[in-house]
Amino acid sequence: MIKKIFAAVLLACVMGLLISSMDIAESKISVRHGNTDKQPLQIEFGKYLCHESGTVINDLYNTAQAVMPNGDTYFFNDIANVFMWLMRQKNKDEIVVWVYSQDTEKYIIAKDAWYSRVEITPMGYGFGAYEFHNYGRSDYYYDEIVLCAARGETLLNPLIN
């Protein structure tokens, strides 16, 4: 009898824990449709998810947005996430990628940015974007940093770190 009561109480506790941890708020957004202007969109903190990692975007620093030719905009909480996602796309040259610049605090075209590899980023990859060249800090071009991401040369790699 005690085993049955214990099992019922344990089951009720587990069910209560599952119900209390459910996300019953508004659904999170990882893709917005209809951005035919191909400009970066305003992000509401806590409402948008990184399309690659599934984490909530709570800060603009190190974020990125990728706009597809059809106007679909994908959001990323780490610059390396957009690069890894971009490598899997068939139409890379038609996708407009925006990265958040740490020096001017606005979105800039990813191909025009300078990059650093030693930043503190949400996913720990270490890539930071800058609008202006800062000698000794932001010394990498777009193609160089995409190649680093493709090779796994990030701060998560113990041989790089």
Pin down the residues of each PLM region.
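Intrinsically disordered, low-complexity linkers and terminal regions
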Residues: 1-75, 79-161
